Amino acid sequence: VLFRSLIMWLFGWLGRRGKVISTPKKIAIGMGVAGVAYLFMTLFSLGEGYPSGTEFRDMTAAGADVVKAGWWVLILYYFFMTVAELFISPLGLSFVSKVAPKNMQGLCQGLWLGATAVGNLLLWVGPLIYNNYPIWVAWAVFFGVCIISMGAMLAMLKWLERVTA
């Protein structure tokens, strides 16, 4: 709730200064912020030399304790992911209702939420990667997906802004 209030305040503050950020641009920024979270996890895991999930399970308890991340890593990661989610999810649903034809708004909103469900179904890719490779590889793949998604939004930005104007 705190982050939502801060971000809404930021949008209002920018709007009062004539620097309104379009919804498609906010979604692209959200993907970039998620990318920052995954880049942080990639670099941190790489720097710490974290093993794959399979290698971690085979370690002794003493060895496993050495390669566990501190609480601050999770807090920083979740901070970025929460901010990214605030840029993407509610704005995406609002954007869909703006651009969908009146007689198809419900269907289009359902498709937006369905896309989220499909994304959740693809979560098996993470364990597939991190059980066979050092965990930084999984974070790097997620980083790449975020950057590609952000790039796709930015590539369509002018068209999307024209459609919503």
What name fits each language-model region?
Residues 32, 79, 110-114, 118, ...:
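Transmembrane alpha-helical cores of Major Facilitator Superfamily
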Residues 13-32:
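Cytoplasmic membrane-interface "Motif A"-like loop-to-helix N-cap segments
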Residues 72, 102-111:
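Loop-to-transmembrane helix entry/capping segments in MFS-fold secondary transporters
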Residues 29-66:
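C-terminal ends and interior cores of transmembrane alpha-helices
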Residues 36-43, 117-129:
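A gly/Pro-rich, aromatic-decorated transmembrane alpha-helix motif that marks the paired
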